[in-house]
């Protein structure tokens, strides 16, 4: 289960209008000021440090577990060279507030929002909302067709579901829920897989 924004035939204003009022207003207000949150994008593993620090902060704050720092660095070293995996940061006054790791699939023309984290100060400035809007518009401006939130809770989930808050956040950007069949394996060596 995921949530996908389809860009085909849409411009930035149309994508923005599909977002909830909070996200629309935050983006418009931030875009109209010189002192607002700014963004940087990188495909270099050398820029992974702030993101991994943010993920550790989120893990401690929310009691979740993320991959090791080496996992994220390896993704960037391997896929970043081809501009298929990158990091975006939201800054205010030169300080990183929020960061996100994304992957681009050129065959499906899709950007995937894989991992994101922030420091506590990010909430005060809505940096996470602004960063996700930035990524969505970056994907649109790169000529991609889709932006995949990479996982949401089932649509009928109530507030007790562990992904409820995160899923509500992801859905507030105007995408549509999509359900896939899941992952399947096909054994290639019959003797190894017989029960």
Where are these regions (language model features)?
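Aromatic (often tryptophan-rich) hydrophobic motifs at membrane interfaces
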Residues: 73-189
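Terminal substrate-recognition subdomain of acyl/acetyltransferases
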Residues: 1-37, 151-195
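A conserved beta-strand-loop-helix scaffold within acyl/acetyltransferase catalytic domains
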Residues: 1-123, 138
């Amino acid at each position: 289960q995921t949530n996908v924004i389809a860009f085909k035939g849409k411009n930035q204003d149309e994508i923005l209008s599909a977002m909830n009022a909070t996200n629309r207003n935050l983006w418009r207000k931030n875009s109209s000021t010189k002192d607002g949150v700014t963004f940087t994008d990188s495909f270099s593993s050398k820029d992974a440090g702030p993101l991994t620090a943010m993920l550790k902060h989120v893990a401690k704050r929310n009691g979740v577990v993320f991959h090791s720092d080496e996992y994220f660095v390896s993704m960037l070293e391997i896929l970043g060279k081809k501009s298929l995996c990158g990091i975006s940061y939201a800054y205010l006054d030169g300080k990183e507030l929020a960061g996100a790791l994304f992957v681009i699939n050129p065959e499906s023309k899709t950007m995937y929002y894989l991992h994101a984290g922030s420091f506590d100060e990010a909430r005060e400035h809505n940096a996470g909302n602004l960063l996700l809007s930035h990524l969505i518009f970056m994907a649109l401006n790169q000529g991609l067709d889709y932006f995949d939130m990479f996982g949401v809770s089932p649509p009928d989930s109530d507030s007790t579901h562990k992904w409820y808050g995160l899923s509500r956040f992801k859905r507030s950007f105007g995408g549509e829920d999509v359900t896939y069949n899941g992952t399947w394996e096909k054994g290639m060596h019959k003797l190894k897989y017989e029960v």
